[in-house]
């Protein structure tokens, strides 16, 4: 039975024999002693395996190359080398899988662009090993947070007939013959399709999540979402993961309070439970990352009305690339100026103009704004977007009519307001944006295992 390297280094007893397995990061020989850097993915540094010339294991050294997979049995001993407390003195080595000089991940620095081309191998690198361990632990932390706060986990559908955001950026799901689909009045007849109507991959689980919040009070979804948005930017991908909580009997203030508690928790979790990875990111990816994340974990989260945000941006004297006017959405440059220069920390922007927000957001008494909020943080700007949902059936129907949104496809959503409706609120947090923020990585393609972007669906 093999021992995980991370557990061996933290719990192993010096002088005892252990069996480990992993992949060779590097091999060097000095004065008749071989030093193998072996990593099984459980930690950043792996472990140093020492093979002395008189050991039977030394006979395998000539066949070992970077990238090989090995099984090693040996004695755990104190290490005289700097930077490591213990190492494994090998007694036997078995080569499980061979490698050669053509292995793409030789011991040198590779660009992120190159590593994207070998996404099937990049998890073996230090940087991406750290990224995906952090991603895994954060996913576990998200479930722990909501479980500890009595939220129900809901699996919302991947295939849907609704477009929550109303942007028409759905990937279509169809079994019709693309070359000769059945036609109705000259157009494809989706009534003959698998589901009997147009369907696509979900852009959000929010609408379905609301239905469960109106039965279980507090729920959350955490799953993949899809946007057929032809954007080749470091912040956009066609497939990504979203965390979307919904709370019944809650207003915008409750929504912001939950978002603040959630972000604080995740920042503290990363600092405390992923300390090795976070220290690596601070050294290799973004100097000062630890302090930046620590400040967010400890800061006061300012609440600022959209009206005030516009006024303060206009008074700043800064010439922005995008105009600053009431009624226009804030761009990333505006968001970052607010959080980095005006506030100097996290900030909620509250109550946006209704004309730039979605139909489901609750109209405020002024009929000019809706109960919407964005959480802005230094370095990235918006990281969370949310709102109080419109619970009044007549107001919701009027808003849909105003925007030309058909009622029939959303009959079930409207019916939820007919019986036992109540104030409710929720928000969305893009999981990849969270991983980028906590790791310092600057491209979404580098925080998801196999990125899906325009004209790229390999692996």
Swiss-Prot record:
<dbReference type="InterPro" id="IPR004365">
    <property type="entry name" value="NA-bd_OB_tRNA"/>
</dbReference>
<dbReference type="InterPro" id="IPR012340">
    <property type="entry name" value="NA-bd_OB-fold"/>
</dbReference>
<keyword id="KW-0547">Nucleotide-binding</keyword>
<dbReference type="GO" id="GO:0005524">
    <property type="term" value="F:ATP binding"/>
</dbReference>
<dbReference type="InterPro" id="IPR002312">
    <property type="entry name" value="Asp/Asn-tRNA-synth_IIb"/>
</dbReference>
<dbReference type="InterPro" id="IPR045864">
    <property type="entry name" value="aa-tRNA-synth_II/BPL/LPL"/>
</dbReference>
<dbReference type="GO" id="GO:0006421">
    <property type="term" value="P:asparaginyl-tRNA aminoacylation"/>
</dbReference>
<dbReference type="Pfam" id="PF00152">
    <property type="entry name" value="tRNA-synt_2"/>
</dbReference>
<keyword id="KW-0436">Ligase</keyword>
<dbReference type="InterPro" id="IPR004522">
    <property type="entry name" value="Asn-tRNA-ligase"/>
</dbReference>
<dbReference type="InterPro" id="IPR004364">
    <property type="entry name" value="Aa-tRNA-synt_II"/>
</dbReference>
<comment type="subunit">
    <text>Homodimer.</text>
</comment>
<dbReference type="GO" id="GO:0005737">
    <property type="term" value="C:cytoplasm"/>
</dbReference>
<keyword id="KW-0030">Aminoacyl-tRNA synthetase</keyword>
<keyword id="KW-0963">Cytoplasm</keyword>
<keyword id="KW-0067">ATP-binding</keyword>
<dbReference type="GO" id="GO:0004816">
    <property type="term" value="F:asparagine-tRNA ligase activity"/>
</dbReference>
<protein>
    <recommendedName>
        <fullName>Asparagine--tRNA ligase</fullName>
        <ecNumber>6.1.1.22</ecNumber>
    </recommendedName>
</protein>
<keyword id="KW-0648">Protein biosynthesis</keyword>
<dbReference type="GO" id="GO:0003676">
    <property type="term" value="F:nucleic acid binding"/>
</dbReference>
<dbReference type="Pfam" id="PF01336">
    <property type="entry name" value="tRNA_anti-codon"/>
</dbReference>
<dbReference type="InterPro" id="IPR006195">
    <property type="entry name" value="aa-tRNA-synth_II"/>
</dbReference>
<comment type="similarity">
    <text>Belongs to the class-II aminoacyl-tRNA synthetase family.</text>
</comment>
């Amino acid at each position: 039975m093999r021992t995980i390297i991370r557990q061996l280094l933290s719990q192993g007893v010096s002088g005892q024999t252990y069996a480990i397995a992993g992949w060779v990061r590097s091999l060097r020989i000095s004065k008749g002693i071989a030093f193998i850097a072996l990593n099984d993915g459980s930690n950043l540094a792996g472990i140093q395996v020492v093979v002395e010339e008189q050991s039977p294991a030394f006979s395998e050294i000539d066949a070992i190359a970077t990238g090989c997979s090995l099984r090693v049995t040996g004695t755990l001993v104190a290490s005289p080398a700097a930077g490591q407390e213990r190492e494994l003195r090998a007694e036997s080595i078995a080569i499980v899988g061979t490698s050669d000089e053509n292995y793409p991940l030789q011991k040198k620095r590779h660009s992120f662009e190159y590593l994207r081309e070998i996404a099937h191998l990049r998890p073996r690198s230090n940087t991406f090993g750290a990224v995906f361990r952090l991603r895994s632990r954060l996913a576990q932390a998200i479930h722990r947070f909501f479980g500890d706060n009595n939220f129900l986990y809901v699996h919302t559908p991947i295939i849907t007939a609704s477009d929550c955001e109303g942007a028409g950026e759905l990937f279509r799901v169809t079994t019709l013959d693309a070359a000769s689909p059945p036609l109705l009045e000259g157009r494809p007849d989706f009534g003959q399709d698998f589901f009997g109507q147009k369907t696509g991959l979900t852009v959000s689980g929010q609408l379905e999540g609301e239905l469960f919040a109106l039965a279980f009070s507090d729920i959350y979804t955490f799953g993949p979402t899809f946007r057929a948005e032809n954007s080749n930017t470091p912040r956009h991908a066609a497939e990504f993961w979203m965390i979307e909580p919904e709370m019944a009997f809650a207003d915008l203030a409750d929504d912001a309070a939950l978002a603040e508690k959630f972000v604080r928790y995740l920042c503290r979790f990363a600092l405390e439970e992923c300390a090795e990875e976070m220290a690596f990111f601070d050294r290799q990816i973004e100097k000062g990352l630890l302090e930046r994340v620590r400040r967010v974990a400890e800061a006061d989260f300012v609440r600022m009305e959209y009206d005030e945000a516009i006024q303060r941006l206009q008074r700043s004297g800064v010439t922005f690339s995008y105009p600053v006017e009431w009624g226009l959405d804030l761009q990333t440059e505006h968001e970052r100026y607010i959080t980095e220069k005006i506030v100097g920390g996290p900030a909620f922007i509250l109550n946006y103009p209704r004309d730039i927000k979605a139909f489901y957001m609750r109209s405020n008494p002024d009929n000019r704004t809706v109960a919407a909020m964005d959480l802005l943080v230094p370095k990235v700007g918006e990281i969370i977007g949310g709102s109080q949902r419109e619970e009044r059936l007549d107001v919701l129907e009027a808003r849909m009519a105003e925007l030309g949104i058909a009622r029939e496809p959303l009959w079930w959503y409207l019916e939820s307001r007919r019986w036992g409706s109540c104030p409710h609120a929720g928000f969305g947090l893009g999981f990849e944006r969270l991983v980028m923020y906590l790791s310092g990585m600057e491209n979404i393609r580098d925080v998801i295992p196999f990125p899906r972007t325009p004209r790229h669906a390999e692996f």
